[in-house]
Regions:
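Periplasmic polypeptide-binding modules associated with outer-membrane biogenesis and secretion
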Residues: 23-36, 46-280, 289, 303-321, ...
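Short, contiguous acidic/charged loop-to-helix segments that flank catalytic cores in large enzymes
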Residues: 218, 273-279, 305-307, 425-428, ...
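Flexible, surface-exposed loop regions and adjacent strand-edge segments
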Residues: 116, 200-204, 280, 349-354, ...
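C-terminal structured "cap/appendage" subdomains that terminate the fold
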Residues: 527, 531, 535-555, 559, ...
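Gram-negative/organellar outer-membrane beta-barrel architecture
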Residues: 119-124, 223-414, 441, 478-482, ...
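Bacterial N-terminal signal peptides that target proteins for export
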Residues: 1-10
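C-terminal outer-membrane beta-barrel translocator/porin domains of Gram-negative envelope proteins
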Residues: 236, 377-385, 389-514, 522-526, ...
Length: 581
C-alpha cells in the first residue's frame, strides 16, 4: 500500500508544561494510510477534543485504540502503530506528533451462509436484497456492509409487512490469524400480514367517495408504500387538514390481517388568501382568493379569485365536482370569468364560461375535454369589434419535478386544440393549436439548465374577429427577454400591434449555484410572432440574471437586451416571483 504523508492542520493541541511556561502548539501528523482507510481513521480521531490531549502514554493508548477500531471496521485487525515527537523547527517551541500506521494484512471474506425462512422466501424484494448485498469470496471484510445488510432485512420487514420477522442466527466470524471472515445469517420472516378493512373516523365526506381513494383491496399483501399512498391521496383532495392512516396491531396480531385506522380532520370550510406582488410585465399587482375546499358531503369545492394590476383586472369563479368512480383523478370543472385589459395597443372586455371534464392517469398526464363560451368587445390597433364564440377543445398536460420549489429536475408539457365553427353559433371559424414546454435538468449539482419552447398556430377565415386574448404576442418574461411584455407581433399601417396567427419562441438558460440559495444565470431567447411563416421576423434577446431560492419560492432579476434590432436598443429589466414550471 502506498504510504502517504498527511498533515492534520485542523487539530491543534495545547500541551501545558508548567504554569510559568507558555504551552507549546502540537501538530498531529498521520502517515502510512490513504483512501478509505485514511478517511475512516480521521473520522475516529475527530472525536478527540484538544482539551483531552495529554503528552503521556495514556493519550497514545487512546489514540491507538481509536486507530485500531477504525481500521478493524474495514477488515484490518493487525496494524503496526508507532509514535514520534519531533520539534517542528529550531526557532519555535512547537512540536509534531508523528503517527505512522502500517495497516497490516486484511481479513477477507472466506464464506457466507444466508438462510431465509418464512413467506419472505418468495418475496422478490428480499431476493434482490440478498443478491445485491451478499459479499464475494475474497473481498476485504467491511463490518459496515455486514451491519447494513442485516438492517436491510429489518427495513424490508417493516415495509412489506413481516412484523414477526427475527434473526434466528446472525454471526460475523473473524479469524485474525487465518485472515478469514464468515457471514452466518438465518432470518425467519414469519407470515406476511395483509390489509384489513379501512376504518374512517372524523370525515365530513361521504364514505363511498373516500373508499374510491384507497389504492389497495382488503386481503392484499401489506405494504407501507401503499399505506403512504393512501395518506397522500386523502391529503391531495384538499378536504382535510390532517390525515393519519395507520395499521391497528391490537386487532390484527393473531389473524395477520391489519385493520387500517384512518383519522381525518376536516379542512377549514372557508379560507382567504391575499398577495401583493410585482413583475416587470404588469407592474405591481394584488390577488385575493376565497376558497371552500368542501361545499357538501360529495366533496364538491369552489373558489373565487380577483386579480388587479394597472393593465389587467380579472374576476374568476370555479366549481369542481369530483366523480364517484375516481374522485381525485376524474372531475368536472365549471368556470366563469370577467376580464378587462388595457395593454399596449389592446383594449378589451371579456366574459367567459367554461365546462371541462378531466381525467388523470398514473403517469401524471392530465387530459381534458373543454367547452368554452366567450364574448369579447375589443379594440386591437385600429380595429374595434365584438365577437361571440362557442368552441370545444382538447388539452393534455403533465408537470413533474424533483427538488422542492427550485427543482433540480423537472418538466412541464401542455398541448391543446380548440375549434370554433359558425355551424354551432360562433361568429367565426378557427382552429387553434398550441404547445408549451419547459425542461429543467441539473448536472454536477451546481449546473442547472432551463429550456423553454412555445408554439402556436391559428387557422381562421377572419383573423380580425379573433379576440386579442386568443391571438399571439411575444416579448417579455418567459417569452423573448430584451423586448417589452407582449410587444412583438405584426403591426398595421399605423404601426400598431395586431397580434399574430403564428408564433414560435424558444429559450436556453444556464444557471450556476455560486453560493447557498443563490444562482447566477445567462440566457438566450429567440422567436417570432407572424402571420406568414414565409416572411420570418425572428427576434433575439440575451442577458444575465440572478436567482434566489427564497422560502416562498424562486425570486429572480434579469437584465436583457435585444440583439441585432435597431429599434430596440435599451435594456429591459425583469423581476419575478414564482415557480419555473
Amino acid at each position: 500500500m502506498p504510504r502517504l504523508r498527511l498533515s492534520l492542520y485542523g487539530m491543534t493541541l495545547m500541551l501545558l508544561a508548567t504554569p510559568a511556561i507558555q504551552a507549546a502548539t502540537v501538530r498531529l501528523q498521520l502517515e502510512g494510510l490513504s483512501g478509505e482507510l485514511q478517511n475512516n481513521v480521521r473520522l475516529g480521531l475527530a472525536s478527540i477534543s484538544s482539551d483531552e490531549v495529554s503528552a503521556d502514554s495514556r493519550f497514545q493508548a487512546r489514540l491507538t485504540d481509536s486507530i485500531k477500531k477504525s481500521l478493524s471496521a474495514l477488515g484490518y485487525f493487525q496494524p503496526a502503530i508507532t509514535f514520534q515527537t519531533l520539534p517542528e523547527s529550531l526557532t519555535t517551541n512547537n512540536n509534531v506528533i508523528k503517527v505512522t500506521v502500517d495497516p497490516g494484512p486484511p481479513v477477507k471474506i472466506a464464506g457466507t451462509t444466508i438462510v431465509l425462512e418464512g413467506e419472505a422466501r418468495q418475496d422478490p424484494d428480499y431476493q434482490a436484497w440478498i443478491k445485491k448485498g451478499r459479499p464475494k469470496t475474497g473481498t476485504v471484510l467491511n463490518q459496515g456492509d455486514y451491519d447494513s445488510f442485516k438492517n436491510g432485512f429489518s427495513s424490508l420487514a417493516l415495509r412489506n409487512g413481516y412484523f414477526d420477522g427475527e434473526f434466528k442466527k446472525s454471526q460475523l466470524g473473524v479469524s485474525v490469524d487465518r485472515g478469514e471472515a464468515f457471514w452466518d445469517l438465518d432470518y425467519d420472516s414469519g407470515q406476511r400480514y395483509r390489509f384489513g378493512d379501512v376504518i374512517f373516523q372524523g370525515s365530513q365526506i361521504r364514505e363511498e367517495y373516500l373508499r374510491r381513494l384507497i389504492p389497495f383491496h382488503q386481503g392484499d399483501k401489506y405494504s407501507s408504500l401503499d399505506l403512504a399512498e393512501l395518506n397522500r391521496r386523502l391529503s391531495a383532495t384538499g378536504w382535510f387538514s390532517s390525515v393519519v392512516a395507520s395499521p391497528d396491531f391490537s386487532k390484527g396480531k393473531a389473524s395477520k390481517v391489519l385493520p387500517i385506522s384512518t383519522v381525518l380532520t376536516p379542512a377549514v370550510k372557508n379560507t382567504v388568501e391575499t398577495g401583493v406582488g410585482y413583475s416587470t410585465d404588469v407592474g405591481p399587482h394584488v390577488k385575493a382568493t376565497w376558497k371552500r375546499p368542501w361545499v357538501n358531503d360529495n366533496g364538491q369545492s369552489m373558489s373565487f379569485s380577483t386579480y388587479l394590476s394597472q393593465p389587467e383586472q380579472q374576476l374568476d369563479m370555479s366549481y369542481k365536482v369530483p366523480l364517484l368512480k375516481s374522485p381525485l383523478e376524474q372531475y368536472y370543472l365549471f368556470q366563469a370569468g370577467l376580464k378587462r385589459t388595457d395593454l399596449n395597443d389592446t383594449k378589451s372586455d371579456t366574459s367567459t364560461l367554461a365546462v371541462s371534464r378531466y381525467w388523470e392517469n398514473s403517469s401524471g398526464w392530465q387530459k381534458a375535454l373543454n367547452l368554452r363560451w366567450r364574448l369579447d368587445h375589443y379594440t386591437q390597433g385600429t380595429v374595434t369589434d365584438t365577437t361571440m364564440l362557442l368552441y370545444p377543445g382538447v388539452s393534455v398536460n403533465r408537470t413533474r419535478s424533483r427538488g422542492g420549489m427550485m427543482p433540480t429536475w423537472g418538466d412541464s408539457q401542455r398541448y391543446s386544440v380548440d375549434v370554433s365553427d359558425t355551424t354551432w353559433g360562433s361568429d367565426i371559424d378557427f382552429v387553434i393549436l398550441q404547445a408549451q414546454n419547459v425542461w429543467i435538468r441539473t448536472l454536477a449539482e451546481r449546473h442547472r439548465f432551463v429550456l423553454r419552447g412555445n408554439v402556436g398556430w391559428i387557422e381562421t377565415n377572419d383573423f380580425d374577429r379573433v379576440p386579442p386574448d386568443l391571438r399571439f404576442f411575444a416579448g417579455g418574461d418567459r417569452s423573448i427577454r430584451g423586448y417589452k411584455y407582449k410587444d412583438v407581433s405584426p403591426r398595421d399601417s399605423d404601426d400598431k400591434l395586431t397580434g399574430a396567427s403564428k408564433m414560435a419562441t424558444g429559450s436556453v438558460e444556464y444557471q450556476y449555484n455560486f453560493t447557498g440559495n443563490w444562482w447566477g444565470a445567462v440566457f438566450l431567447d429567440s422567436g417570432e410572432a407572424v402571420n406568414d411563416i414565409k416572411q420570418t421576423d425572428i427576434k433575439t434577446g440575451t442577458g444575465v440574471g440572478i436567482r434566489w431560492a427564497s422560502p416562498v419560492g424562486p425570486i429572480k432579476l434579469d437584465i436583457a437586451r435585444a440583439v441585432g434590432d435597431k429599434d430596440e436598443r435599451g435594456l429591459q429589466f425583469y423581476i419575478g416571483l414564482g415557480p419555473e414550471l
